[in-house]
Structures are given as structure tokens and as C-alpha cells.
Amino acid sequence: MRLVIAEKPSVAAALAAALGVKNKKDGYMEGGGYLISWCVGHLVELAEAAAYGEQYKKWSYDSLPILPQPWQYTVFKDRQKQFRILKDLMRRSDVSEVVNACDAGREGELIFRLVYHAAGCDKPFSRLWISSMEKSAIKKGFAELKPGEAYDALYASALCRAKADWIIGINATRLFSVLHGKTLNVGRVQTPTLKMLADRDAAITSFKKETYHIVRLDVGGAEAASARISDAADAEALKMACEASQAVCVSVRRERKTEQPPRLFDLTGLQREANRIYGYTAKQTLDLAQALYEKRLLTYPRTDSNYLTDDMGDTAVHIAALLVGKLPFMEGAAFTPDIARTLDSKKVSDHHAIIPTMELAKADLAALPESERNILTLAGARLLFAAAEPHIFDAVTAVFSCADTEFTAKGKTVLCDGWKELERRYRATLKGKPDAEGDEENELILDAPTFAEGQSFDSPAARVTAHDTQPPKPHTEASLLSAMERAGSADTDPDAERRGLGTPATRAAVIEKLVKSGFVQRKGKQLIPTKNGNNLVCVLPDTLTSPQLTAEWENALTQIARGAAEPEDFMRGIEEMARELVKAYPFLSENQKDLFKEEKAVIGKCPRCGGNVCEGRKNYYCEKKDCAFVMWKNDRFFEERKTAFTPKIAAALLAGGRAKVKKLYSPKTGKTYDGSIVLADTGGKYVNYRIELARDKELTQQA
């Protein structure tokens, strides 16, 4: 019997369908000589710091650095049942072989190996390595299973990555949290990402607007523009001089240019475009692509490749033909795909680029949720663009001299519209969504006029236009994903498995964590660092805020995965880094002590002592330590009346002793009514309230 372990239930179901395994059990499927079960993402993780001793349960400077030896592992509490199922299956006497069918990559290898070792399994295992959930790809993968030990070095690199992230993340987070008296999450990927947002925010804040002017001449129906002129009076003087002069063409340059089709999507590219066009967050796009993958309509989404493997040519041609018939914007388009330019096995790592699958033939796109349909269409459109002809045009630049000043006119003559025609067709269906990117502020891109050297225009009409220099734009998820992808790439081995900050699969989670931690806030599509976010990057050392650390790690991990470096050497360097970090920050400077001090929201005066009453997470309390006045947000009085004890109600009670509230619930009648909540404080341990109705009928209850 062969036990197959997938990364998630949906993948296990697809494997079972391809292998004809139909008998469903509790946590697995059985049939035809196969047992098919699954993890639920990570089932086993590195244990928390507290597992290594009582001294680590409380955060303190004296307990740092924490350097586990030996390492301990734990099963996620909410996934214990599935782990026990896998453990029991591995121990079955009729199971002779285990197949690692977790995602083909470094993280998938780690997920399987941790479960395998935690279960105490020593049976031989093999590796399934596929990029598509189509039946043909699954069957081919099972026919070409690799020995598990062939991926030992990959597992070693994955485990080193996890341990290194643990050591630096745990120690840096505890160190700076203890120093500043506030939980400050620090991570190898999220902290440099936050730094990029903070740097952009600082550039915007320090930006000083400058006005400049451009003089524009009418030369035979085309427009020639001057360089930028700072002074408005100088621009006006030039305009008048030009209108009294002759504009002479001094040079004409015609250049044949080719704009190649865009490459196929990797996950980051898909997330960028979906954010720009539809406003989807990176996490939303990943979730939608994953849902389509599990429906077998899209290939594996967590990829950093922009190409297909060389053997996928025929499949891609068939898929392109399906797309032409399925996508409305292709109706009437003359299109013959050139798939060859999308094929390059040497540029495919774990998984090929994201494209629709042959299941498209049977799919009813109209039946899909709109958001899933948008992502599938986006991926399909990109395959068609990538397989279309290049966009070829002649770029014409004509230079004129007038009033001893140079003016430039630009134009283009399109010779072959190519993939741009398909892109225009697609964008026309987007109904108000953004057009193609580009900024043509100072050049008029039209059909190129015909100019000749020596051609002149007497007293040309002229005008002056005023412009303001623009500050950098706040990062959107689209621009931040691009920045994360490029960060540190110049210092990273071209053959490294991961380049930039994070992986295609984890970048969305990094952004979400920054938002959830309160270091970043969303304003529409924009990502803006909060005050705490800006302060955090200011207090951390460059080693933690620069992508250089990730570049160095990835280079080392790549060598480990190749078997060219020892994991022990890498880990010794990580431990030394943690020791040096703790040693460098024994205390805070005076100007840093109050950086993260919470500003208390004062909502009124205490009725007992006259001190300030502030809002806490669970209550409203008097800030004077010797005063016991406190109003609890979850007070039974409010809960029974199904009324949220809001700051507005609390402020009214403190200001006037009463607050008018609508739709109070009556536990006796089950109906709602309007009335006033009256503060009836007697100075005891608990604060009392009562209801006052319009007809002066009162109901008193102690909280």
C-alpha cells in the first residue's frame, strides 16, 4: 500500500480523482492500492520559546539571546487530529511506501519532512513534483516519482531558513519589545518591507513642490515643446519672442522600435496587475488564484516563474485556442499564437508560469464568482498577449530652433499593432478601470508628422503651460510587491531559489501582518505607515531594516540546497548575529524612551475625584491610581440590553450623568424601546446604571 500525503485537502481530492481513489474515510481516502491523506498547511512547527524553560515564559532582557539546543517541535493545537491520522496511517503494517505530494518547493518539502519525523516514521518515501492539477500531469508525475533522499539538501535549506527566522525574529522582537515596553514584531522580511513604506512616506513628507513652465509651439499642426523653465516671466518672454521669430527644423530622427509582448504571470505579477486593475489585495488575489487552482481551472499559483517548460508547447496552443473562443474581447480578433517565446525550461524553477488549464473547455465562466472570473480572465488574457506579435513602430523625434531655443516634437507611426491591440480590446471591457500605465506629460504621441531638416514655420503660434513637480506616490500593493520583488536582487545569486523580500506565496501575508500589527494602514489602494511603523524602523539597526540580510541568507541557502555548503556553518553565523544584536542594545537613549508610549484617549472627568477618565481596551477608567472608578465595556447592564457601551455613551454619562440611547432591548418583552441610561454611581466597587423612560418610569439594576 502506498500512502500519499498532500499539502491540503483540495489537492488530495484532485490526486484521488486522477488515481481513481474513491473510498472516503475520516481524514483520508483509500482505494486501488493507495491511501491519500493531507496536511493542512503546516501541521508541525518549531516550538515557542517558552517550551525551552520557565525562564523564557516571561519576556526579559536577561533571558536573551534564546538559542535552542536541541530544537523542539510541536503540532499546531487546532490540527492535532489530522496529525494523529497521518501518524496512524504511516504506522499501518500494510503501508510500505510514503509519497511526499506536498507543494513542489522548499516550503512544501519542510511541511512533509516535519510531519514525517514528528510521527517517527522510517519507511521509504518518494517525491511527487508537479505544477498542474490536471489528471494528465498527475499521472505523469506518479510515473516519474523521485527518491525522497534526492531532496535532502532542499529540506536542509528549508529547515535552516525556518530556524534562522525563529532565532532572529524571536530575539529581535523580545529585545526591542522589552526595551520599549510595547510589543514590536520584528522579522527578516516584514521589517525591511516596512522600511520601504517608511522611506516613501518620508520622501512624500519632505517633498517641496516647485512650479515650472513649458513653452509649446504649433509647427504644422504638431506641437514642439521646450525644456522646463522655472520662471514664469522667462517663459512668457520666450513665447513672445517665438511668435515674432521663425521655427526651423534642425534635425529629424526616425527610429524603428519593437515592444515585446509581456511575459506570463508569476504570482507577484498577477497580484500587481489585479491590484492595479481591480483593487484586489495581494492576499485576495492569492486566495482567488488558489480557489481556481483547486477547481483545476488555473495552474499552481505560488510560482516565481514567467515561462512554461519546453514540453508544454502543444498544451499552450490548445489553451490559447480555447481562450480565443471563451473570452468575449477576442471576438473578431485576427490572432495566431506564437507560443515558442513563452517556453524556456531553463527559466522555470519549481513551477512554471500561471496559465489557465485545459479544463477551461468544460467550464462555464459565467457560473464563476465575478472575482474568480476576473482573475481567470486576467491570466488568460496575459497568455494571449504573451503569444501575440510584438508591437512595432517608428518613433520620430524632430528638433526645432526658435528664438535661439531648442524645441522637440515627438510622434510615432505604428507598423504592427501586435499584442497592444489585444490589450486595448481587453481594457475596453473593464468599465472604468485604469488604462495602461504611462505618463506623456511633455510629449504628444500621435501619428508622426512628416518633417524635413531645414523646414521652417514663420511666427508660429505659441502658448505657455504651467506644471507642478509631483511628490512620490504612496505605495500601493502593486508598487510595494514590485519593490519587494526587486529588493536586494543585485546582491542575490541569480540561481538562488528566492530573490527579493519574501516569496510569491508569503508576500501577501507579510503585508497583512504589517496592517494587523498596526504598523501600516490601508487608505483605499494606498499603504501608509503609522506613527508606530515609522518609529519602529528608526530604532532598529540597518541589519534588520535592509534587504541585504535576506540576500545573504538566500545565497547561503541556495548553496545548502545544492549540497555545496554545510547547514551547521550557516546556523553558527545566525546564532552569533543574535548574540551581537542583544549585546549592542543593553538600554535605550533618553530620546527613545517614549517613542511608543500610548496616547491615552481622555473622554471625560471622573465623577468621584475629578481626574481624567481614559478609554482602555476593555473599560473606561480614572487615570488616578488611588481612584477605583471604572466602567466596564462588557457590563451586564449593557449586554442584557444588547447595546454597545461606546465612547460616545461613556462621554455623555460623564458629562451630564445621562445618555439618550435608541433601540434598547427589553429582556422581558423581547422588544426594543428608546430611553436614557442614567449614571447612578454610589462610590462602591461597581458603577450602577438605570433606565429612565420618557414617562419617568424607572428601572434600576446594579451592574
Identify the role of each PLM range.
Residues 1-162, 166, 460, 470-471:
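Intrinsically disordered, low-complexity regulatory segments
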Residues 2-3, 90, 118, 173, ...:
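Basic, low-complexity terminal or inter-domain segments flanking catalytic cores
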